[in-house]
């Protein structure tokens, strides 16, 4: 009998509510016979916040933690000041669930036009540290709104936090082309950069099959547009990863075909998977949104649970659909049906 996995579903806002059901359908079809899924839906996002002021109530977060994984649609609404939902929902889940790896695959599919003149074979993944660095909230300000105001943001890097994400990157590289590129700015950020490099060198000794090199962040941004095929696994910190993942999404044709995962690799808490596109309120409710990225997030969820063959069914179906019909204008439902029909 197939094991049943509990999945927390947060459709969120805008087109998130339209594309998430297709991720669920892809999960079920790809894993048919090997895994079953039990869903718990959570009404979290802009509408909930505007209705009763709640972002992530404690009891609901507790129920989310009891699941095996999380499927997220999209969060954001122009009626709400930027940052409120992102900090109160997405970042809170990331930190409370210790999702210390932000995983962002970037692949240029046949049938998708890259903005690069000669993109080559683009297929790499960014492994971004997700709970430390400049985004952990250390810092402050004094003498606000005066000429003497002082503001600080402190980048926190711990050996423990760095080593666990480095190990994740090398383990992932073993399943791919066996190459890791550390991206940092160690010539200027000498303390954090030196620690990152030493830990990469140490862990690298345990993976003799995996080669590794280093690039400064400025050089890496250049190579992402001049020679992206050189990369396999890009390993970097929170801030640099935030920059690189956006650029990576652009070189493969935009956010419509990109998914991401916020991973707790210890499985102490559930990991979260989502398309990287936003809530797109301008087309919400019109059956226009492309569900491909959401469906790819379902493949990432399956890979995380250990169902690589099931995930491959989704990847194969998506690649075939994009190659044949990627330039065809289709509705949300039609794209979803076309992809599922190939599985």
Curated annotation (Swiss-Prot):
Homodimer. The keyword Iron-sulfur does not apply. It is found in: Cytoplasm. Belongs to the isocitrate and isopropylmalate dehydrogenases family. LeuB type 2 subfamily. HAMAP family: LeuB_type2. This is 3-isopropylmalate dehydrogenase. Mg(2+) binds at residues 218, 242, 246. GO terms for cellular component: cytoplasm. It comes from Bifidobacterium longum subsp. infantis (strain ATCC 15697 / DSM 20088 / JCM 1222 / NCTC 11817 / S12). It holds the Pfam family Iso_dh. Pathway: Amino-acid biosynthesis; L-leucine biosynthesis; L-leucine from 3-methyl-2-oxobutanoate: step 3/4.
């Amino acid at each position: 009998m197939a094991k049943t996995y509990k999945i927390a579903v947060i459709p969120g806002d805008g087109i998130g509510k339209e594309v998430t059901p297709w991720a669920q359908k892809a999960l079920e079809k790809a894993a048919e016979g090997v895994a079953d899924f039990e869903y718990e839906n959570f009404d979290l996002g802009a509408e909930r916040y505007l209705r009763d002021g709640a972002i992530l109530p404690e009891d609901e977060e507790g129920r989310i933690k009891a699941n095996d994984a999380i499927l997220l649609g999209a969060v954001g609404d122009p009626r709400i000041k930027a940052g409120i939902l992102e900090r109160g929902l997405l970042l809170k889940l990331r930190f409370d669930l210790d999702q210390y790896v932000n995983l962002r695959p970037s692949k240029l599919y046949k049938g998708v036009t890259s903005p690069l003149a000669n993109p080559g074979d683009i297929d790499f993944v960014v492994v971004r540290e997700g709970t430390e660095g400049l985004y952990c909230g250390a810092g402050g300000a004094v003498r606000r709104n005066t000429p003497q105001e002082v503001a600080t943001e402190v980048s926190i890097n711990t050996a423990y936090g760095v080593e666990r994400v480095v190990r994740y990157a090398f383990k992932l590289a073993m399943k791919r082309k066996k190459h890791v590129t550390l991206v940092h700015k160690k010539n200027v950020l000498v303390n954090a950069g030196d620690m990152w490099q030493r830990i990469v060198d140490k862990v690298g000794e345990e993976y003799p099959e995996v080669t590794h090199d280093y690039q400064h962040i400025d050089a890496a941004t250049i190579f992402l547009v001049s020679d992206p095929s050189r990369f396999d696994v890009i390993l970097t910190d929170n801030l640099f990863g935030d920059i690189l993942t956006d650029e990576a999404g652009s070189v493969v044709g935009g956010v419509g075909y990109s998914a991401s995962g916020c991973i707790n690799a210890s499985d102490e808490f559930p990991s979260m998977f989502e398309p990287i596109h936003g809530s797109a309120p301008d087309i919400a409710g019109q059956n226009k949104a492309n569900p491909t990225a959401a469906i790819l997030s379902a493949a990432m969820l399956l890979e995380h649970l250990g169902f690589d063959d099931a995930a491959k069914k989704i990847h194969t179906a998506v690649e075939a659909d994009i190659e044949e019909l990627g330039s065809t204008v289709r509705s949300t439902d039609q794209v979803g049906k076309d992809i599922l029909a190939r599985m």
